[in-house]
Amino acid sequence: MKFNEFLNHLSNYEPGKDIELIAKEYGVKEVIKLASNENPFGTPSKAIECLRQNANKAHLYPDDSMVELKSALAQKYKIQNENIIIGAGSDQVIEFAIHSKLNSKNAFLQAGVTFAMYEIYAKQCGAKCYKTQSITHNLDEFKKLYETHKDEIKLIFLCLPNNPLGECLDASEVIEFIKGVHKDCLVVIDAAYNEFASFKDSKKHLEPCELIKEFENVLYLGTFSKLYGLGGLRIGYGIANANIISAFYKLRAPFNVSNLALKAAVVAMDDDEFTKKTLENNFSQMQLYKEFAKKYDIKIIDSYTNFITYFFDEKNSTDLSEKLLKKGIIIRNLKSYGLNAIRITIGTSYENERFFTEFDKILR
C-alpha cells in the first residue's frame, strides 16, 4: 500500500519508556521514571476523588462547550471564554496552529533545539523549517532569520521555558521581539513549563491576558500535564484573540477531550496545596542536581523547568542511558535531538537520591 509522500520524511516522536516494560525487559523490581517530566507526586488527591465520583459517567460524551473549565481558566487569567480553546493536551492546540497557518508554500521559525512536535506536525503540511544556529532561544538570531525570510515565515514557535533544554527568556525580551513581527505571522508561546519558571524568577512570567490584549497574533499554550499531574488524561489549552480561536474550532473534532479530563482539570486548578508542594520540591531538588553536575564537571544550562539536561564531552549519552536502565532508572537520552546529553525529570527526594547514587557509580 502506498501512502502520502510526506510520510517518508517524518520520524516518530520518541516518548519516555514505560515503567512496566522496563521492569520486564531488565528484570528490575523497582523502576523510577525520570524521563517524561511528569509530576513526581502523581495526580492530586482532589482530582483522584473527582475521577472516582464521575467514573460512572464515562459512557457519556462530554459537554462540548467545555464551559466549566473555560470559565475557570477565564477567571484565573482574567480573559473571556471566547479566548480559550481546550485540546487533548496542548499538543493538539499546536496542531491546530500549524494546520491553520502552514502549507507547502510557506515556513515557520524555531530554536535550534526545541520541542520535536513542532517540526513533525509542520512537515505534514510540507512547510519549510528555519532554525536558529544556537540550540537555545537566541532572539538576535530569531530576528535575523525572521527579517531575512519574513515573506515566507507565517508561524514562530517560542518554547518558554524550552523543552528539552530548560532555558527561558525574560518576558520583556519576548514582548519586544513580538512587536517586530508582522500581525499576519502567528507567534506561539508554548508555556507548558512557565509555572516553574515564574516560581523561580518573576521576570520570566508571561501574562496571557496582557499578551492577547496587546497582540492580535499571539497564541499562549498551557497544559495540565506537568504542574497539575494530569498527563495521562491528555488535556491542555490555548489562549488567543477570538478570531484565532474561531479558526481553530474549524479544525477541532467534537468531543475532543473526555468528560473525566475536563472535570479533573477544574478540580486540579483549585488545589493550591498540591501545586505549592510541587513547585517547592522542584526548586529545592533542582539545586541538588546542579551540585551533582558541578562535582563531575558536567555541563548544564540553567533550567527553569521541572527537568535538567546534562551535557557530556567524552562519555556517550546512549551508553549512560542504557546503564541507568539496567539499574531501573529511566531518563531521556537526547541523541535523537543531535545532542550528547540526557534530560532528567526532577523527582521526589527519594527518586533523586536513587539517581545520584547509581549515576555516581556509573561515572566513577
Swiss-Prot record:
Keywords: Amino-acid biosynthesis, Aminotransferase, Histidine biosynthesis, Pyridoxal phosphate, Transferase
List of residues that carry N6-(pyridoxal phosphate)lysine: K226
Gene3D superfamilies membership: Aspartate Aminotransferase, domain 1, Type I PLP-dependent aspartate aminotransferase-like (Major domain)
Enzyme class: transferase
InterPro entries documented for this protein: Aminotransferase_I/II_large, HisP_aminotrans, HistidinolP_aminotransfase, PyrdxlP-dep_Trfase, PyrdxlP-dep_Trfase_major, PyrdxlP-dep_Trfase_small
Cofactor names: pyridoxal 5'-phosphate
Alphabetical GO biological process terms: L-histidine biosynthetic process
Catalytic activity, reaction form: L-histidinol phosphate + 2-oxoglutarate = 3-(imidazol-4-yl)-2-oxopropyl phosphate + L-glutamate
CDD domains for the chain: AAT_like (cd00609)
Keyword Cytoplasm: no
One Gene Ontology term of the molecular function aspect: histidinol-phosphate transaminase activity
Entry EC no(s): 2.6.1.9
Pathway where it operates: Amino-acid biosynthesis; L-histidine biosynthesis; L-histidine from 5-phospho-alpha-D-ribose 1-diphosphate: step 7/9
Domain of life, per lineage: Bacteria
HAMAP family: HisC_aminotrans_2
Family: Belongs to the class-II pyridoxal-phosphate-dependent aminotransferase family. Histidinol-phosphate aminotransferase subfamily.
Subunit structure as annotated in this protein's UniProt entry: Homodimer.
Name this protein carries in UniProt: Histidinol-phosphate aminotransferase
Organism: Campylobacter jejuni subsp. doylei (strain ATCC BAA-1458 / RM4099 / 269.97)
